[in-house]
Swiss-Prot record:
Transmembrane intervals: 21-41, 62-82, 90-110, 113-133, 158-178, 192-212, 239-259, 310-330, 331-351, 363-383, 388-408
Swiss-Prot/TrEMBL keywords: Cell inner membrane, Cell membrane, Membrane, Sugar transport, Transmembrane, Transmembrane helix, Transport
Family classification: Belongs to the major facilitator superfamily. FHS transporter (TC 2.A.1.7) family.
Gene behind this protein: gluP
Membrane topology of this protein: Multi-pass membrane protein
GO BP of this protein: D-glucose transmembrane transport
The protein's name in its UniProt record: Glucose/galactose transporter
GO CC list: plasma membrane
GO MF entry, a single one: galactose transmembrane transporter activity
Record's function text: Intake of glucose and galactose.
Annotated compartments: Cell inner membrane
Top-rank taxon, per record: Bacteria
Amino acid sequence: MATSIPTNNPLHTETSSQKNYGFALTSLTLLFFMWGFITCLNDILIPHLKNVFQLNYTQSMLIQFCFFGAYFIVSLPAGQLVKRISYKRGIVVGLIVAAIGCALFIPAASYRVYALFLGALFVLASGVTILQVAANPYVTILGKPETAASRLTLTQAFNSLGTTVAPVFGAVLILSAATDATVNAEADAVRFPYLLLALAFTVLAIIFAILKPPDVQEDEPALSDKKEGSAWQYRHLVLGAIGIFVYVGAEVSVGSFLVNFLSDPTVAGLSETDAAHHVAYFWGGAMVGRFIGSAAMRYIDDGKALAFNAFVAIILLFITVATTGHIAMWSVLAIGLFNSIMFPTIFSLALHGLGSHTSQGSGILCLAIVGGAIVPLIQGALADAIGIHLAFLMPIICYAYIAFYGLIGSKS
């Protein structure tokens, strides 16, 4: 397989060829689980707060805009912060900020002001952004460069596990706790789960501060001896940022429309409850695919694997648009399986050979996650104009670009 980060990459840990980084990777895997969990918990928070504050759909979607807006605003400063204080300290800072964000849900519930919930969510998402900027590249250098994409894919598999578990957690601790008819009780339902999350983030921050996982050295030349300038001078990074933008946009778009799509009488005609249960196959497929990919991609070219999965996703979307019934239903749900390796592979390919610019490059890539807020809006406009069925043509454009990046754009 193609090496995502070359053997002469200036990013390295002390005696990296001799050390076993299993415990450090295990700790990092917990972080991936946590931010996947937090992100998917928004799917429960949106309908819950919509009912509490009697919001319309546009107002309730401010939850997602605040979350992804944090990526857009915080990513680049986070990259500079991580470069200045190290990956490990960046992780600790991210955990503390995320813990503060979770804790802010308690006064937000007490005062029952929607804007306070949005502010708390923004702080929480800012912490998650710092974690992503620090942890993603950290995983790529904890071990052999040749298996960087494989390691990142494995940790992303646990991110998918978090997205699978979060709705169950939210349904039990938020929605079931809000069965009381009063608004006060419904608002208070978020206190306990977010208090638990604040404590979890705090414990993880203490663990990372005490255990002191190996620090990364960034003291050798980057690719092509580009010691000056910035990460923006690397073509494959810029194209990779576009890849992250369209990938996250496509994933969020498909996932966001699944319940309505599967409830459509011309597709599966499921009730919304049954449709929601079927959505688990979409996220579960991503989780399974990442576990498989973490092993398989040790032996497969990263770019070719990315392009193959993108082409299959395109085929599945064409089938989704062209058919109805169970064929359309299972075609769109199967996309989750082929989404599995895309984010970690694009991320790893884009950071190839950035050397001392890697932390800044990671910030740029995390900045591109704002695609999760923009692409769904475009698909939503299409759904209003031409119907939800034909609106699934939009993600095809995204996956076509991802295929291009895997075959051509990722070449440095």
